[in-house]
């Protein structure tokens, strides 16, 4: 096994190390009037969400998996006063604060926080206007007056517990993503500092995509099927131009992959990422949401003579996967058993969003009873977790985890 700090050459190899984010005060800054702006449909109850998340983390530890936390890694990356100051300035610049006085007040507030992890968690939680000195009306600009009812000086980042999306581990490399929405793109700042300054990861990991790019890609659309084959989704959150940039970098940097299967499917919120409708659970088994199958287009992408070669695949999906994975047959396990009502309900509650921690061993929400029963009938071992509050953010076990190390398969 390589000593490289990032080692992810499959979706199913035994998981050794994973990064999570424990939901924090950012969830308490969700308001009904601004849910759409922050990409939420409902407001989780923080206390119960934390209990559910702690149980998820413990279930992973019980399987011998080392659990890292985004907030701790980011804090450990602020290794000098200069780097800490730089982090605060970048955070302020990306918060799009229009008023100079407000920016000065927030800078003072953040510099007043001496503990690095407390600082990181405060940047995640957002900053309410009531936390700052009040600006007299005569000193306010037009934007301040028009948006006087908006409660935040800096928006919270409530999606952070979905650590799968801001960056993705691919082989020994990382795709540091440019995300679909401004409210989530700020999340990638933490990954930037981890992979630039962290004592273990800083400067030791190649980037195959950079957050400075102007086209969008998210980790839920990046799946590592084997040491030779990747799958990427062309979705609501990831566009084809980003995928082409990613693939050119992967092939040029010799990260180790020979082919990419690009999945184009319905562009809407309920199917926001490939991993909300399609995940690998064993050497020869995948979960899939049946609603995407009719409109699914798959393209094979290779790199020849220093350019991408793209071929649309016309055959059966299971046969295509079997051929590319070198197995005799692939089983597609349909969410909800293919029943239109059960499939729609359980996909919405992330029945297709499984986290595989070893071949045939998956973490799932306990609430998706129809899909879970079928998975067990296929011989999989299920580690069931509660997700009544966590699921309100529209993400499951895979969404909530970013593997840093897997065993080879």
Swiss-Prot record:
It catalyses: L-arginine + H2O = L-citrulline + NH4(+). Pathway: Amino-acid degradation; L-arginine degradation via ADI pathway; carbamoyl phosphate from L-arginine: step 1/2. InterPro entries: Arg_deiminase. It comes from the Bacteria. It is found in: Cytoplasm. The active site is at residue 399. NCBIfam families: arcA, PRK01388.1. This is Arginine deiminase. It comes from Streptococcus pneumoniae (strain CGSP14).
